[in-house]
Amino acid sequence: MGLFDAVRRVFGRGDRAGTGAGDGASASDEDGGDWGLDAEAAAGDPQPGPRRRGGGHGRHWDTAVANDETLREVIATTLDDGQVRSSRVPDVDAVEYGTGALRCRVLRRDGDVVTAYPVAEGVAHESTVTEVTPWATDLEADATVVLGPEEFATYASSAWIAGGVPLGDGTVEIAALAYAPERTEESTYQTEDGGEFSTSGIAGFVPVDGGGVADYAFQSTVREIQRVPLFTANGYRFRVPLTRDGDGGEYETWLYAGAHAIDGRVPEAGDDVSGVFWVQTAVQ
């Protein structure tokens, strides 16, 4: 049994599977299910396909702010005090606000707000973009990338700059934002050949049934922890291996979590951590 198959067995199906995170719900929804997510909202977030799709960031904000009031404050402050960045798309710009590794980005067209989302500092990897699905706004997109042994869909946070994402090889900055991460105790499972598989120290992620395009159930091990400001509150980011290749080489990312989102004690270096995150990429 390979690592990816083993992670699927732990997270992907059956009574251990989580519910998904859609893009339509508000940050204050509390009917979260096993993973702190809203399956009903997820039903409104279609999987990527050949045509342009709708989308939004309602549930994505749950990783960074505790409630709708805080979200409104963050967006208002961004528009009042943020730095304006230009786009190569006519009549489009972005306003960004935030100190440190996590910022709010508000996209505007002709001065009108199109959307707002949290954007996080990630870890840069040499990667390949194999598929791009534009959103209906023409300023956002899902990008499928290859990282080590995995090929997976992400939210392309850089698409607004040029109105799309280039296919092919390049440098891709990857960050993950967790909805409800928690410290994870070791579990063991019987394999098909009669052996045992331990979850201790694994690093992997799988799509969440009913979740958004870039939502994944994950488990990993904390290598480093930093306390970071998350707008008006405190939060954390954890350096973790996102996946490993067959030779044991690790592909790391920064995993972000607001203090309000962490279930139980804050993980420390060396702890295994699990939950559901959404993945964003900036193609450089």
What are these regions (language model features)?
Residues 77-215, 235-236:
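Long, hydrophobic alpha/beta structural blocks
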Residues 219-222:
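Conserved beta-strand residues within beta-sheet cores
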Residues 271-284:
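Short, charged beta-turn/beta-strand-edge "cap" motif at the junction between a beta-strand
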Residues 17-26:
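Intrinsically disordered, low-complexity regions enriched in glycine and serine
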